Amino acid sequence: MQSYNVFPALVIITTLVVPFMAAAALLFIIERDPS
């Protein structure tokens, strides 16, 4: 039953990381914009 705790942890990590990566990509694109 220990391995069952891995899935919720992955869901939480994904939920936290995905918006951060999206924001970082947005900032990177905005910074690269010559305008």
Curated annotation (Swiss-Prot):
One of its GO terms (biological process) is photosynthesis. It is a single-pass membrane protein. It is found in: Cell inner membrane. Keywords: Cell inner membrane, Cell membrane, Membrane, Photosynthesis, Photosystem I, Transmembrane, Transmembrane helix. GO terms for cellular component: photosystem I; plasma membrane. The chain crosses the membrane at residues 10-30. The G.violaceus PSI reaction center is composed of one copy each of PsaA,B,C,D,E,F,L,M and Z, and forms trimeric complexes. This is Photosystem I reaction center subunit Z. It comes from Gloeobacter violaceus (strain ATCC 29082 / PCC 7421). The lineage of its organism: Bacteria, Bacillati, Cyanobacteriota, Cyanophyceae, Gloeobacterales. The gene is psaZ.
